[in-house]
Curated annotation (Swiss-Prot):
This is Phosphoribosylformylglycinamidine cyclo-ligase. It is found in: Cytoplasm. Keywords: ATP-binding, Cytoplasm, Ligase, Nucleotide-binding, Purine biosynthesis. It is an enzyme of class 6 (ligase). It comes from Burkholderia mallei (strain ATCC 23344). InterPro entries: PurM-like_C_dom, PurM-like_C_sf, PurM-like_N, PurM-like_N_sf, PurM_cligase.
């Protein structure tokens, strides 16, 4: 068989010519290894670079149930690109998944990330991964693997997308599923650190309309920093609370806000009645509502409105839970109670 003929004067092509820089990928791995190493914990077997990451379930679990979660950061990334601010979105990525699996009572064990871009910028990617490692440290889980995908033509230069994957464990007898929630139980609200990672399509629309100076002072920091504040990670204080108090249900307040997330842990026939005056609406949400002309009902179904996690306990345990969470450094309020639903009523109402 004759070899294929080359076009006249054609030069040989390389992967770099196609837009993929293998050397940049190798440089990134070298940069992020120290970040990942700081997250190592008991159970990690082997180092970074294998085809698969190995983790041994801690021996303290008699009947371990694995709990998994995956999420992204959404269009908060578009604001990160606009501001050229990439140091906080990694923590957002971790928080979205570890807070989700925490709701079932799970201790996060390990985390994996996926970073996709059109052209790999090593410094930007390393900054993002450093934030991921920070989030893993705050959650007590190991960053044991990930994927960096450089895909020319898929994303504009300077842009990327993120996905995260968390796996945790809970004792089978201690799974939290909301089945014990009853009338008279108390809903506690833990303060958010800001907008977290939901509602940014509306945030960006409000910014487009208001055209504010994002570098201007906003309650002691720039408006940009207030908007980009990383999602709070509630793992350690809530795992400690679960050791002392029977937590009946939890809801991570993400897309859908308070009114759509709390019902996910309530049995049919129960409603959580929340008092919107029980906690202060943070200045950032006041700013968004004012400049966007957003109705109260829309605020409560899009944004967390200052509450990042809801915890449901018995009335008898409520004061102890408040005290323990406050001692752990959390801002927390009694924001509502559980009662029987009325005919045709939603499972969470804000009054």
């Amino acid at each position: 068989m004759n070899p294929p003929k080359s076009a006249p004067d054609a030069q040989g092509l390389s992967y770099r010519d196609a837009g993929v820089d293998i050397d940049a990928g190798d440089a990134l791995v070298d940069k992020i290894k120290p970040f990942a190493k700081k997250t190592l914990r008991d159970g990690v077997l082997g180092g970074i670079g294998g085809f698969g990451a190995l983790f041994e379930v801690p021996k303290k679990y008699r009947e371990p149930v694995l709990v998994s979660g995956t999420d992204g950061v959404g269009t908060k990334l578009k604001l990160a690109f606009h501001l050229n601010k990439h140091d906080t979105v990694g923590q957002d990525l971790v928080a979205m998944s570890v807070n989700d699996i925490l709701v079932q009572g799970a201790e996060p064990l390990f985390f994996l990330d996926y970073f996709a871009c059109g052209k790999l910028d090593v410094e930007t990617a390393a900054t993002v991964v450093k934030g991921i490692a920070t989030g893993c440290e705050l959650a007590g889980c190991a960053l044991i693997g990930g994927e960096t995908a450089e895909m020319p033509g898929m994303y504009p230069d300077g842009e990327y997308d993120l996905a995260g994957f968390a796996v945790g464990a809970v004792e089978k007898s201690k799974i939290i599923d909301g089945s014990t929630i009853a009338e008279g139980d108390v809903v506690l609200g833990l303060a958010s650190s800001g907008i977290h990672s939901n509602g940014f399509s509306l945030v960006r629309k409000i910014i487009e309309r208001a055209n504010p100076d994002l570098s201007a002072d906003f309650h002691g920091r720039s408006l940009a920093d207030a908007l980009m504040a990383p999602t709070r990670i509630y793992v350690k204080p809530l795992l400690a609370l679960m050791e002392k108090i029977a937590v009946k249900g939890m809801a991570h307040i993400t897309g859908g806000g308070l009114v759509e997330n709390i019902p996910r842990v309530l049995r049919d026939g129960l409603t959580a009645e929340l008092d919107q005056h029980a906690w202060p609406l943070p200045p950032l949400f006041q700013w968004l509502q004012q400049h966007g002309g957003v109705a109260d009902a829309e605020m409560h179904r899009v944004f967390n409105c200052g509450i990042g996690m809801a915890v449901i306990v018995s009335a008898a345990d409520a004061d102890d839970a408040l005290r323990q969470l406050a001692d752990a450094g959390e801002q927390v309020w009694k924001i509502g109670t559980v009662r029987a639903s009325r005919e045709g009523e939603a499972q969470t109402v804000v009054v």
